[in-house]
Regions:
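Cation-handling catalytic/transport regions enriched in His/Asp/Glu
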Residues: 1-209
């Protein structure tokens, strides 16, 4: 049942043979789009000649967009986002002395997820409202499951945890316009490219480990 090192090695090889050539073509198109003739490593985050898409709106406006998005997505996500926002379970604004990074963590005694981040005015701010919220929704539902799931296994293992977060990034696509307005198409392309490019990177880290 499941898979082992041999199966993962086979998957990595398939990525090398099937995915990497396609990513090379995608990156060539990106470089043509940006006008960078001899791209260096530090150019890898530049996706558009006129700048990458950024979210439009204040903190309150983005959080209101998140509430609208999750209310329209499903009754379960509506309940979830109301709980998270009403109980102030988001600490996402940058401030002096605050540690870097972004993550979701469960507070078992309260059966609540907590989302930590450092918004900086980039598309990554919205990724917090989708990716980290995907982790948080999994924890929120697991903690309230009628199956009484033990705390130790409410959070999935490293090999499956990203299913919930990455899925939420794509499930919320119909609402990305709430955050990016006229730059929505640019964000959709950036998001698709970056998700695709992650595959060989993830495999590289796995092989190193």
């Amino acid at each position: 049942i499941g898979y082992g090192p041999a199966e993962v090695a086979a998957f990595r090889q398939e990525v090398v043979e099937q995915v990497v050539p396609m990513i090379q073509k995608a990156l060539a198109l990106r470089n043509k789009r940006t006008g960078i003739e001899n791209p260096m490593f530090w150019d890898s985050t530049i996706s558009f000649a006129d700048g990458n898409p950024v979210p439009h709106g204040s903190y309150d406006e983005l959080m209101a967009g998140a509430r609208k998005m999750y209310h329209e997505l499903s009754p379960e996500t509506a309940e979830f986002i109301d709980f998270m926002q009403d109980n102030e379970m988001f600490d996402v604004l940058s401030r002096p002395g605050k540690m870097s990074g972004g993550y979701e963590e469960m507070l078992p005694d309260y059966k609540t997820p907590f989302i930590f981040a450092n918004w900086n005015g980039t598309a990554g701010d919205v990724d917090v409202l989708t990716h980290e919220a995907g982790h948080a929704l999994e924890g929120y539902l697991a903690a309230r499951s009628p199956k009484n799931i033990p705390e130790d296994i409410q959070c999935p293992g490293m090999e499956s945890a990203e299913i919930h977060s990455m899925s939420m990034e794509f499930l919320t696509a119909p609402w990305h316009h709430l955050f990016f307005k006229e730059d929505t198409d640019k964000y959709e392309l950036l998001h698709a490219e970056d998700s695709f490019i992650f595959l060989p990177y993830g495999c590289m880290v796995d092989e190193f480990q």
